[in-house]
A protein has these predicted regions:
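Polytopic transmembrane helical bundles with strong interfacial aromatic enrichment
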Residues: 1-179
């Protein structure tokens, strides 16, 4: 279970970093800098040139997301938004892998295997909420649930990692099998 322990610690670190990117996005007002999903202004990696940024700002005004008097979206805001968005795919992959590994290891206690189902469910909910946060133009209920579920994902990953570490410790020093 050493590799499982490393994977669970990686999940904790990845989720923590994702929450940091989310906080950075919130505090730099980057949440509405990209109005579409799955692409960003119709591209995987939108241009951050001055002309492109001017075009994006005009598009945001036409779509009613920004007003002409609002501060225009800057390249750094789009970059931060993309960082949070694309890192989410990596985090979802790590948590999905951890969830399936927990389910596959029949030697694990039932509570740890069941945590695999919980991880798969919660990462699916969180990913879906992230998509709807963008598509709803940061509607406050959707956005609030996205933030709360993000914190819950971190808590579940930390507890899972601690449970795996405890199991490894008990097995190593006492030959204890917690089935």
């Amino acid at each position: 279970t050493a590799s499982l322990q490393y994977l669970s610690v990686l999940a904790v670190a990845a989720v923590f970093l994702q929450l940091t990117f989310g906080a950075l996005m919130r505090h730099t007002y980057s949440g509405l800098s990209i109005p579409d999903f799955p692409l960003a202004y119709g591209q995987i990696f939108p241009s951050l040139s001055n002309d492109a940024i001017a075009s994006y700002n005009y598009q945001l005004i036409l779509e009613g997301i920004k007003w002409t008097g609002d501060k225009p979206v800057a390249a750094y805001q789009i970059f931060i938004h993309l960082l949070h968005r694309y890192w989410a795919f990596i985090v979802a992959g790590i948590i999905t892998l951890l969830g399936f590994r927990l389910l596959a290891l029949k030697s694990l206690p039932k509570y740890l295997r069941n945590t695999g189902y919980l991880l798969l469910l919660i990462v699916t909910i969180q990913f879906t909420l992230g998509i709807f946060t963008v598509l709803s133009r940061k509607e406050y209920i959707t956005t609030s649930f996205h933030v709360v579920i993000g914190a819950l994902v971190l808590v579940i990953c930390v507890i899972t990692s601690l449970r795996i570490a405890r199991l490894r410790w008990l097995n190593k020093y006492f030959g204890y099998d917690e089935k």
